[in-house]
Amino acid sequence: PVLQGLRDVPVPVSVDTIKPEVMRAALAEGASMINDINALCAPGTLAVVAATDAAVCLMHMQGTPGTMQQYPGYGDVVAEVKAFLLERVRAARDAGIASERIAVDPGFGFGKTLEHNLELLRHLRDFDALGVPVLAGWSRKSSLGKITGRPAADRLAASIAAALIAAQNGARILRVHDVAATSDALSVLAAVEKKR
């Protein structure tokens, strides 16, 4: 019923799911994007998205939601996340999903330590090599709490700072809670960068 009610809203609707049956139902009800924390690895998910004109965001996660933060470890977090996402972008293209419909998300906070998250943010531009837009979601993340010592409700300034850094480092899509404040900050950044 919620998706039906949003059909007349003039903005894209993204549905977060890893299940092909939920994807199918959501897309049939008018969702225009699937956000999959498993990067369309589950059987049937590639085919469901490929059969539509919907966009998809492929996210990296080490482990599962229940285990991802127990012992995250990488030899080279940037190289490993990039290699995984490259493989998933290729799989999506091979399934018939056009590059114009694909975005990638390094999965900040999903099976990563604070230092892993910061290293990915520092090297976000490396993901431009994948040839699809990069999505960054730092808004109110626990990593920001570790840096600032503030609870989630008090992380607006930190969230905006992370969003601006992500944008400067190549992110073309930002997942945020505080849309107006982040938009204002991005407008200032754009005005400054226009004069460079």
Question: Which stretches of residues belong to each language-model region?
Answer:
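Phosphate/pyrophosphate-binding loops at sites that engage ATP/ADP/AMP, CoA/4′-phosphopantetheine
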Residues: 88-101
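Active-site-adjacent loop and "lid" segments of alpha/beta metabolic enzymes
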Residues: 1-12, 17-23, 27-28, 32-91, ...
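Active-site metal-binding loops of divalent metal-dependent hydrolases
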Residues: 108
